[in-house]
Amino acid sequence: MDMDKWIFIKTKFETMIAYLSGAMEFADDEGSGWRKDLTKWLDLNLGHNVYDPVIQSAELIKKYGASDYRNWKESDPKRYAEFIRICVDYDIETVRNRTDYLICLWDNNVLKGAGTHAEVTLAYESNKPVFLINKIPKADLSGWIMACSTKIFNDFDSLKPYLLDKYR
């Protein structure tokens, strides 16, 4: 095979990107711990990249000088909503157009927020696989979220062999 054909074939394959969805606003450490662990695993075992909204939010906070944005919720609600809207728009664009599948940690922390619900729904609407790690009693899991999920797992240890089989 000549070099031109090899380069074309090599560049034709793009790295898959997973969106790591889950609670941030009401979660300890904004949910960064499980996302860091899964990011390493996906890279090491599948060569997949991730979109980590915790990291992206930190970049947006810096870009827009919003280090104290959480205080704005009560002190300046309009400013708070404007900044959150920037984050929401970025996340919507990313789920729809920049990622290949979504991994979601569904626990009690997501129940007070709205972003995770929206991300799961957007991924479903965009025909992207949604792999849900359910940490609440099945009786309490929303039928909507169940319907939007491609497959539901009890823990990350159950998800990993499935991903290996599907993507390796």
Where are these regions (language model features)?
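Conserved catalytic or regulatory cores that recognize and/or transform ribose-phosphate-containing ligands
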Residues: D2-R168
